[in-house]
Amino acid sequence: VIASRFDMAPTSAAQTQTFSPPPMNSEPLGGPIDAGTFREIAKSQTDMVVNIRTESKRETSLNDFFGGGGGGNDPFRRFFGQPTPDQEPREETVQAAGTGFVIDSSGLILTNNHVVEDATKIEIDFFGDEEGNYYEAKILGRDPLTDSALLELIEHPDQELPVARFGDSNQMAPGDWVMAIGNPFGLGHTVTVGVISAIGRPFYPVRGRSQEVLQTDAAINPGNSGGPLLNMKGHVIGINTAIQSISGEFNGISFAVPSNTVSKIVPTLIDNGKYPHPWIGITGKDIDPDLARILDLKQAKGFLVIAVVAGSPADKAGLRGVSQTQVIDGKEYPLDGDIIIAVDDKEVRKISDILIHLQREKSVGDVMSLGILRDGEFMHISLELVERPDL
């Protein structure tokens, strides 16, 4: 897990929390980048990153102690040919480590939701604290969909801490240098560098629900979650959140939640403890070459609406799902259904284009215009976005 932190200064825990991200500087970095550039960023930004230590409770049994769980892994069955004896579950304390960064002088720390969501105790370790002090924190707000969590310090250090700055994640492009700072394997502050590998990647922090992330090859390992991904100005342009790996360790593919996404939701997390994500209320699939051929489309692009949730904005706006199918060569294909090809006059090639537009540009209560193909005819449909329900 990684956790990052924006600067903070000591305050009273009872102080009213406010948050206003500093203006983003979108100008490209000028001048050459060399080893000195990385050294200077690491030196100037490491102090604003924190280590997060958590404790959580889980129920365990004798099977867990021996690594059992039934089947061929059960030691009683393996060695004695006997069933596992009945054992009352017992509660166990589990410790974990992550990263975070302070985003406001009142003592607000940003990290990943998965770092703290089950925590019964959260402690913060500030870089450079030679006495090894840990400061207790609590969860102020969480957003599982963007894997973001906002912490508030209960205990405060005596000294004022440096403040991290947000950069404009929309300005990042493949090939741009980035730096990650985190707490891999609980080792403490560690710096790695890489480049942006891709932008606009779909990511699924909650099953069936996708969000946009940045992809990087900067080394991220367990303990890094929640830490900052920095551009070459030392500005936070992402929160490191996950890796793609069979082994569970770094394999060259890491993901970060864009800073623009986070800065959008933080004020609402402060006020309400959660963020209401806008919702359309449809299911469907991207148009691929086979589907384009069956539906007699000139190009394999767009998003086919297969089903519309009753009572949803899409339903109220009159969006239509699939009503007819046909089996061709043993595979069932839809023969109708609205095809979304634009949102607010922006082209839609696949579902990720819709989701990214919702994430970047839209909020609950906004009106969104859909450009659709229905029975070969182009038309516009407008709908009012509502809060995504817990389906």
Outline where the language-model segments fall:
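Serine-dependent protease modules
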Residues: 3-301, 306-310, 351-366, 376-380, ...
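Conserved PDZ fold ligand-binding element
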Residues: 109-113, 316-351
